[in-house]
């Protein structure tokens, strides 16, 4: 799904997942919700703050669906806007259904999508970084980058679920 508010602002996959997650957690407190490694840390923080269990997954449609089954997650999403609903749906992504669920959220409030956008945490993230690397050394390179990041004081966490991710 893609969503743009009345101010012309794009709501990215992790922002939409926060909105879907907030609504779900009102109905099912403590629900497990999955994001992928490209989602901002704000997603995971916001879902936990709302009383959910936030889980980070590797990137990819089949990997997210498998993680949903493994964790019993009711909701999952990717930065690409693929949103997977197991709550009141069949556990896969469907853009029309995701749109209907967004309309449901809007119908349950007097706020506009622009108002809901304003309620989201301000996010800063970097684009995905891909560096050409021969297959025979790529795992060693990721391990070395991971170790260097762990050695830096300003890095608050290093996540190696899928490649390497650093939070500052």
What are these regions (language model features)?
Residues 2-16, 43-44:
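Short Gly/Thr/Asp-enriched flexible loops that form oxyanion-binding sites at enzyme active sites
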Residues 10-27, 32, 58-59:
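Short, acidic/small-residue loops that bind anionic groups at enzyme active sites
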Residues 28-168:
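Phosphate-binding and adjacent anionic-ligand microenvironments
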């Amino acid at each position: 799904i893609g969503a743009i508010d009345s101010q012309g602002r794009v709501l990215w996959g992790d922002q939409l997942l926060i909105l879907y997650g907030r609504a779900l957690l009102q109905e099912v407190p403590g629900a497990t919700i999955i994001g992928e490694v490209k989602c901002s840390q704000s997603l995971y923080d916001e879902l936990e703050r709302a009383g959910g269990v936030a889980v980070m997954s590797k990137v990819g449609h089949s990997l997210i669906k498998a993680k949903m089954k493994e964790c019993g997650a009711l909701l999952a999403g990717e930065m690409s806007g693929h949103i997977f609903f197991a709550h009141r749906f069949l556990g896969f992504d469907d853009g029309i259904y995701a749109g209907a669920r967004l309309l449901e959220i809007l119908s349950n409030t007097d706020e506009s999508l622009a108002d809901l956008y304003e309620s989201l945490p301000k996010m800063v993230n970097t684009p995905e970084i891909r560096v050409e690397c021969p297959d025979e050394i790529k795992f060693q390179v990721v391990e070395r980058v991971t170790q260097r990041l762990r050695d830096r004081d300003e890095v608050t966490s290093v996540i190696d679920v899928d490649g390497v991710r650093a939070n500052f």
